Amino acid sequence: MNNYTAYVTIKDRIATVILNNPSEGNIIDEGMASTLNSIFIKLNEDENIAVVVISATGPVFSIGRTQISSELSIHERRQILHDLNISDNLTRLRVPTIASINGDAMEHGLEIALCADIRICSTSTRFRCNDLYNGSAFPIDGGTQRLPRVIGTSWTMDMLLTGRIVDAQEALSIGLVNKVVKNDILENTTSELASLIASGATIANQYAKEAVYSGMEINLTDGLRLETDLNVILQSTYDRSEGIKSFLEKRPPIFKGE
């Protein structure tokens, strides 16, 4: 068994990042956050990676983060919050990301899942954002910003203000996850999706991701210009010409990410 609180495996251009502290509910502490950030930075520099999957060992995805003492100074607290930040490096990944949520994703665990482009969960998974409800904390890693972008303002306020548990089926109905599958097929379902994405044109996938997320932060006119610019750039790539050539030759394309 791997002794690290988080680690990565790479196979067939798919990197699987695994939270690995099941005895503690895969709780996010400074050590795990540091390891995850290092992994994400290195993966973003690896041009051979086409897809990143985030998963966890044990019966839960992550039940949250380590408690921060109320006796700390503002400076000390700010430093710990900075050290616990994972979302910045996760969302900077150029390639598509999939959260394979194998169990409860609470508080910081939910915030990590929100950073993924696609979320698949098991039928036993529950979600909760109870930082405000328990009165001891406040979202620290993008929860108040990414949750409404995924499920809308009303559902976000519902989850934040009540701290209630959202089960897998409700999560699917409000758009929090893309798919719900039985626990015993979650890994295979995720693997099949990751393989499908990895078989596509890596550069085109990256440009699509850039267009969608950057477009959400600018007006429609500028977003359309960005889409056009990326389209023009894409036409000059090897993968674009290979896609056309393979179609004409009636064979599977062999993309190089170039």
Feature-to-residue mapping (PLM):
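Conserved CoA-thioester-binding segment of acyl-CoA-metabolizing enzymes
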Residues: 1-57
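C-terminal alpha-helix plus adjacent terminal tail
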Residues: 1-15, 46, 56, 61, ...
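Hydrophobic alpha-helical segments typical of transmembrane helices
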Residues: 82-86, 143-146, 155, 207, ...
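Hydrophobic alpha-helical membrane-association signature
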Residues: 32-36, 82, 112, 186, ...
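Terminal peptide-recognition signature
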Residues: 17, 21, 35-36, 54, ...
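Crotonase-fold acyl-CoA enzyme core
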Residues: 6, 89-203, 237, 245, ...
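Glycine- (often His-adjacent) and acidic-residue-rich active-site loop
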Residues: 34, 41-42, 48, 55-92, ...
